[in-house]
Amino acid sequence: MDRVAGQVNSRRGELLELAAAMFAERGLRATTVRDIADGAGILSGSLYHHFASKEEMVDELLRGFLDWLFARYRDIVDSTANPLERLQGLFMASFEAIEHHHAQVVIYQDEAQRLASQPRFSYIEDRNKQQRKMWVDVLNQGIEEGYFRPDLDVDLVYRFIRDTTWVSVRWYRPGGPLTAQQVGQQYLAIVLGGITKEGV
């Protein structure tokens, strides 16, 4: 019984991975249940054995990704010694997500705004607010403790970091000439060069 359950869960995971790649490449609207079933070599009806709808697949992909990301973020905020190290950790965790959850990040970037208006996906807006608060708190702490320049517009810095980080998923490809960590370190050096207080 457990072995069968494991096989079902494994197949479900394979189908989710396939769906994520298709959603990221084609977009949610352009990807049908039939497309996913054809890609998996099964009938559409067989896909419904694993998922009630395409929306369930998207929900599971985004929830899983956001749960993972925020667990990483919380761990960094709770375990690092100072705001500078926290900012560095949050920054690099975002690039880790781009490397290891590439399709989910693309889906999130392309579809989150539209999906957030649907009751099933209301958690997306909550997560966006939590993300903003986490980053803004770290930036404010960094200013208060003398790590970052006191004249910074924290909201502007947050938006700059958010947009430059997540938009890189559009051109970055896992397995390319640079790892996400290398890209993240270069981006981080540019950001820190602009916000750190002299002498830090």
From Swiss-Prot:
Residues 32-51 bind DNA. Residues 9-69 form the HTH tetR-type domain. GO terms for biological process: regulation of DNA-templated transcription. One of its GO terms (molecular function) is DNA-binding transcription factor activity. The keyword Transcription applies. Pfam families: TetR_C_24 (PF17932), TetR_N (PF00440). Keywords: DNA-binding, Repressor, Transcription, Transcription regulation. It comes from the Bacteria. Homodimer. Controls the expression of a small regulon that may play a role in the utilization of cholesterol. This is HTH-type transcriptional repressor KstR2. It comes from Mycobacterium tuberculosis (strain ATCC 25618 / H37Rv).
